[in-house]
Amino acid sequence: RQLYLDWIPQIMYNHHQSGPAGSVVAGPPYRDPFNHVYDPLVITTLDAVGAAMSSRLNLEGKPGYTQRNGSVFSTWFNGGLRTTTYFHNMVGILSEIIGSPTPSEVPLVPARLLPNGATPFPVTPRPWRYADSIAYSLSLNYAVLDFAARNRDALLFGIWRMGRNSIERGGRDHWTHYPRRIAAIQEAHARDNPPAKSGATEDDDSGASAAGRRRIPTRYFDDVLRKPELRDARGYILP
């Protein structure tokens, strides 16, 4: 009630612990694939807030932020404080940070030492104190608040636009694309166009390899993905 009826925030941030070994903190953007039932603006705004968080740490010389495939966190668990917000067109943030009142060390994890898209600024093995975790958490708070202050109009318009999108979707036929339905397009095309039995190899452009690379006619989109029985429900009537 407090979150969804009284406050109705545009961003909700949940601090949690602990982060993956060899990193300091895991946060957004989260790993692919994201839950494809969400409005795409939820995901892109989530990415933007995540970029502000990691950039703030980098600016302050605080390494160890990991994202996407650098952690196990996704947008698929529907029972958490952070993930339920997505169904209300809010940007739910979860960060998982290392540290506790007991001093510890950042362990050596060789696979995390090379900078990449998941961990642009790797942390090296070092002693870790609870004060370090608090300093990182404060920086992340300021990053989110600064982003919200600088993008106030965009966030307010965005949550309105997402709500409007939901209303419009409820007034017309709509289909959600699921992996199994995407695979059904390829299966239907393969059934209708079996590869030639000419002894062709994968490197032979005249045989099965070339058939697999041929463009699939757009009629398969309507035939498979736009079946009336696969339409999203416009509402549910409970007795």
Provide a role label for each language-model segment.
Residues R1-L46:
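Active-site/substrate-binding loop(s) of hydrolase catalytic cores
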Residues W7-I11, S54, P63, H88-V91:
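Loop/turn elements at helix/coil->beta-strand transitions in domains of secreted/extracellular proteins
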Residues P40, T44-A48, W128-A135:
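Soluble non-cytosolic domains of exported or imported proteins
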Residues V49-L57:
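Acidic, glycine-rich loop-and-strand cores that form catalytic or ligand-binding grooves
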Residues L59-P239:
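Hard-cation-handling environments
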